[in-house]
């Protein structure tokens, strides 16, 4: 599996008890020169991605192509998995992508595709594919993509000239991007029927966009002590303005580059903003412990006038768990002659049982809470004979680099 990118060597890694990204790892540099943890000694972003891609290719090429491999990538590592998926001809792989900058609609590498930032060596490589080798339309998903609303690496505005939306996404990188395992509670955010999550399927990929309760724009005010009810009241009208930087009717799997002009009805925009003011007042009163005196209803995660999210359903991945993944049709493409990676890759056929698809009613049976990655990965190792301690899974499967710092991309 692969973890998030910069600040420390990268990992393609697996949950192993308390350290949510420990376990058998495919190590790579994870650099974002010159601002990552190794500073001037780190690889550039582009070099780091290529290194991780080569090493992942070596590891997977050494495995039995008839067995299913589960790989997880967080941030830069999700980019590596996206590139690998685009290049490989091997099937039998389940991908879990967390905060993926290559998310087709929202990922910053997709918004500004086709360019390379010179000196820093950051190729804006474009969207992750939404098909897999051997996969055909109508078959069960092979890929699960999780992103927080307003995380600027994975949910960047479609209309970046909306200054509020862009500033909000940049602050989302600061306040959201490095904290998925502590902010996103899978027992609620990914639970069937979860109102806080928008779940959509495009091609072979199920996308989960987890709603953010407070705009990142307001987080600095929260840090300096502005009362939370006041911030909650401000969120509703501000969210209407921020959401004008997006088009939430597009699927996260629909490739969408940044656009200059937004064509919209200004009367509708103004009406939504005005309606959001009393909603915000009621939200603030409710946050302070009072009734909603103006009688308004709470808006969804996309704000007043925004589309309603499609919550996850109870049957996510059940067919995938019951069936074999598609067989590889030809050998893996990548060069496998470079340095070996330590440790075996585990295989699994029941990973997706815990991941909901769009559409069914909620279940009332709570699951023990672990971190986001713990919960996503644990099911991937249930059938691998992994040891357990104190009820926590101790799996051992593929990963990419050493996880020490969780904030940078």
Describe each region flagged by the PLM.
Residues 1-74, 83-409:
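Composition-driven, intrinsically disordered low-complexity tracts enriched in small residues
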Residues 77-78:
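Catalytic nucleophile loop
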């Amino acid at each position: 599996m692969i973890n998030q990118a910069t600040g420390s060597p990268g990992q393609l890694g697996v949950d192993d008890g308390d350290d949510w990204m420990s376990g058998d790892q495919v190590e790579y540099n994870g650099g974002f020169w010159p601002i990552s943890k190794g500073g001037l000694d780190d690889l550039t972003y582009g070099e780091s991605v290529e290194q991780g891609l080569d090493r992942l290719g070596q590891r997977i090429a050494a495995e039995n192509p008839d067995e299913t491999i589960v790989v997880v990538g967080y941030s830069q590592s999700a980019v590596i998995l996206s590139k690998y998926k685009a290049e490989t001809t091997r099937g039998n792989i389940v991908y879990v992508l967390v905060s993926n900058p290559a998310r087709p609609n929202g990922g910053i590498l997709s918004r500004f595709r086709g360019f390379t930032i010179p000196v820093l060596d950051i190729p804006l490589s474009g969207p992750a594919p939404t098909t897999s080798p051997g996969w055909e339309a109508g078959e069960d998903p092979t890929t699960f993509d999780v992103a927080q609303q307003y995380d600027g690496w994975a949910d960047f505005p479609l209309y970046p000239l909306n200054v509020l939306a862009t500033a909000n996404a940049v602050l989302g990188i600061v306040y959201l991007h490095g904290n998925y395992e502590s902010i996103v509670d899978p027992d609620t955010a990914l639970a069937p029927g979860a109102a806080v999550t928008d779940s959509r399927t495009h091609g072979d990929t199920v996308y989960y966009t987890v709603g953010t309760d407070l705009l990142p724009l307001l987080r600095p005010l929260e840090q300096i002590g502005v009362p939370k009810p006041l911030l909650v009241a401000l969120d509703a009208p501000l969210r209407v303005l921020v959401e004008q930087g997006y088009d939430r009717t597009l699927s996260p799997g629909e490739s969408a580059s940044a656009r200059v002009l937004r064509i919209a009805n200004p009367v509708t925009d103004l009406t939504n903003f005005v309606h959001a003011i009393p909603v915000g007042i009621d939200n603030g009163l409710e946050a302070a412990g009072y009734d909603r005196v103006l009688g308004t209803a709470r808006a969804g995660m996309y704000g007043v006038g925004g589309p309603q999210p499609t919550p996850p359903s109870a049957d996510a991945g059940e067919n995938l768990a019951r069936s074999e993944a598609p067989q590889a049709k030809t050998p893996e493409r990548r060069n496998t002659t470079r340095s070996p990676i330590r440790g075996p890759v585990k295989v699994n056929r029941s990973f997706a049982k815990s991941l909901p698809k769009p559409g069914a009613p909620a279940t009332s049976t709570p699951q023990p809470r672990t971190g986001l990655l713990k919960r996503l990965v644990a099911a991937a190792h249930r059938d691998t004979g992994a040891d357990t301690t104190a009820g926590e899974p101790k799996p051992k499967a593929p990963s990419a680099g050493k996880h020490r710092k969780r904030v940078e991309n």
